[in-house]
């Protein structure tokens, strides 16, 4: 089996597995929607003439983000609700949120660039979603949401809250990254995503920074260079494999 998509020369690959393994100068090989190899060293055995290759030199790769508390526009007419939801989901997608958990079954959808699942259970760990809710006592383990749909809250990115948590409240980068990737996947039984491991779905973000710490220290500058959903790059342009 050869790779349909291969990302090479990754400065830092944050797998978000149970040990939070970080691989340096690594590569990811994908066969259609699944990850078939992550490693360092030579990747040539995974190539054939049809393999699409992405060079991520000087960049890091993380799992695509998961927002576990999306609230749709339920207070408007159905037609307006669908239109407003589409606009909101597009804006979140531009900020790397490729999976969402929603409390409205009408908002469920699975598309090439983004999935929305109906919330069938309440999380056992707290969800941080508003800057005004942040206290000096931050729970050791938490999930993160951008808080879209709360009263007077039109935030389409988890960058503002993660910036404050990292810079002001000194929450470590591992805790932050897991709160928007592997932890929500585990909490809502999305076993096919949330980490970069062999056999998982290739939902990936390529960031224009060498470390995740740099990403959490930055506001106001788009740092997502590439987005890959189900093993296919769709941002900044489609790359058919």
Please state what every model-predicted region is.
Residues 68-71, 84-127:
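Divalent metal-dependent hydrolysis catalytic cores, especially in the metallo-beta-lactamase
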Residues 10, 28, 33, 58, ...:
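Divalent metal-coordination and catalytic microenvironments
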Residues 1-47, 212-214, 232:
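N-terminal metal-binding scaffold of metallo-dependent hydrolase/deaminase domains
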Residues 14-16, 180, 201-241:
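C-terminal cap of metal-dependent C-N hydrolases
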Residues 41-49, 109-112, 125, 136-137, ...:
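Short loop/helix-cap segments at secondary-structure boundaries that form the rim of catalytic
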Residues 37, 96-99, 226:
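Residues at the N-termini of beta-strands
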Residues 135-206:
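His/Asp/Glu-enriched, well-ordered alpha-helical/loop segment
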């Amino acid at each position: 089996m050869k790779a349909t998509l291969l990302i090479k020369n990754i400065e830092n690959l944050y797998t978000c597995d149970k040990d939070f393994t970080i691989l340096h100068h690594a590569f990811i090989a994908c066969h259609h929607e699944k990850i078939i190899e992550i490693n360092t060293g030579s990747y040539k055995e995974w190539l054939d003439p049809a393999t699409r290759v992405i060079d991520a030199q000087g960049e890091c790769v993380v799992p695509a983000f998961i927002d576990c508390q999306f609230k749709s526009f339920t207070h408007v007419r159905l037609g307006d609700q669908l239109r407003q939801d589409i606009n909101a989901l597009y804006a979140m997608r531009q900020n790397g949120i490729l999976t969402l958990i929603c409390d409205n079954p009408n908002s469920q959808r699975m598309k090439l660039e983004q999935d929305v699942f109906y919330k069938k259970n309440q999380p056992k760990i707290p969800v941080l979603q508003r800057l005004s809710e942040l206290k000096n006592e931050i729970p050791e383990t938490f999930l993160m949401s951008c808080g879209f749909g709360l009263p007077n809250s039109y935030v389409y990115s988890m960058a503002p809250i993660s910036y404050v948590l990292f810079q002001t409240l000194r929450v470590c980068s591992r805790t932050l990254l897991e709160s928007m990737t592997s932890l929500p996947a585990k909490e809502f039984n999305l076993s096919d995503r949330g980490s970069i491991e062999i056999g998982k779905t290739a939902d990936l973000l390529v960031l224009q920074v060498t470390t995740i710490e740099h990403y959490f220290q930055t506001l106001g500058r788009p740092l997502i260079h590439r987005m890959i959903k189900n093993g296919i790059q769709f941002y900044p342009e489609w790359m058919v494999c």
